[in-house]
């Protein structure tokens, strides 16, 4: 499949995301996502961040397997989570769960610096290679336990988590700057919610449930490292 074919498929996907946003107005409180987010989604070629054999399916609005029992998230969910995060050009963003780097690349289009943690070494290596090939030099990838965050680079303006703990890990709350935002799926597998957490200037955290989701468990990922 040629790049022009991918371009047409990507444009169709962006239109689908826009339509789903309209239908999700009651959850999101608005009928359109930030144009900066949609522009970033348009700039990042999703087919470069999926396994080669799945490239023909890269622009279907669905999760896709990337190996090791993991998936690349549904593009609509990637767009919504990025929009909720409200990334600014001066922001340092912590991402938990690099996968093959698709969400990292979206964030890299918007932020000053992205720090991403991936538990599985092979996925982290593949992500680094893909990000480098696409010219995203403002992403640092670390192999490790995402529940611990990345203290050496904290505090962070924004935090995004792509696997679901039952409760928000305390280290991630601690490493979020006052005035910062975190987007994270959390809860039991049968009752997960996408959550927007905001830390006020006094350091208190408030949370808002956005809508039900289903992500892999962050605790399961931690168990793999023991």
Describe the predicted segments one by one.
Residues 1-53:
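N-terminal auxiliary segments of SAM/dcSAM-dependent transferases
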Residues 1-20, 156, 174, 183-226:
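SAM/dcSAM-binding transferase cores
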Residues 10, 74-78, 100, 104:
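Short alpha-helical patches at coil-to-helix transitions and adjacent helical residues
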Residues 19-20, 24, 37, 53, ...:
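Conserved alpha-helix/loop element of class I SAM-dependent methyltransferases that forms part
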Residues 22, 46-49, 136, 181, ...:
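Generic structural signal for secondary-structure transition and capping sites
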Residues 46, 50, 55, 60-62, ...:
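Glycine-rich, flexible loop/turn motifs
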Residues 84-206:
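Conserved nucleotide-cofactor-binding alpha/beta core module
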């Amino acid at each position: 499949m040629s790049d022009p074919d991918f371009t047409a498929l990507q444009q169709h996907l962006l239109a689908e995301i826009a339509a789903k946003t309209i239908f999700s107005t009651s959850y999101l409180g608005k009928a359109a996502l930030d144009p900066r987010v949609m522009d970033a989604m348009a700039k990042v070629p999703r087919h470069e961040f999926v396994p080669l054999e799945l490239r023909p399916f890269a622009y279907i609005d669905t999760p896709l397997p990337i190996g090791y029992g993991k998936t690349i998230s549904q593009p609509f969910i990637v767009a919504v989570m990025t929009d909720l995060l409200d990334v600014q050009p001066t922001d340092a963003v912590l991402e938990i769960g690099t996968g093959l780097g698709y969400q990292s690349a979206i964030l890299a289009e918007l932020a000053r610096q992205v720090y991403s943690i991936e538990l599985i070494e092979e996925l982290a290596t593949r992500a680094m290679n893909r990000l480098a090939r696409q010219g995203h030099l403002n992403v640092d990838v670390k192999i490790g336990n995402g529940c611990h965050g990345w203290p050496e680079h904290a505090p962070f303006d924004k935090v995004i988590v792509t696997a679901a703990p039952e409760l928000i890990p305390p280290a991630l709350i601690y490493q979020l700057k006052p005035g910062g935002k975190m987007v994270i799926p959390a809860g039991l597998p049968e009752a997960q919610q996408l959550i927007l957490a905001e830390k006020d200037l006094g350091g208190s955290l408030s949370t808002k449930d956005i809508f039900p989701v289903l992500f892999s468990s962050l605790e399961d990922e931690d168990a793999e490292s023991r």
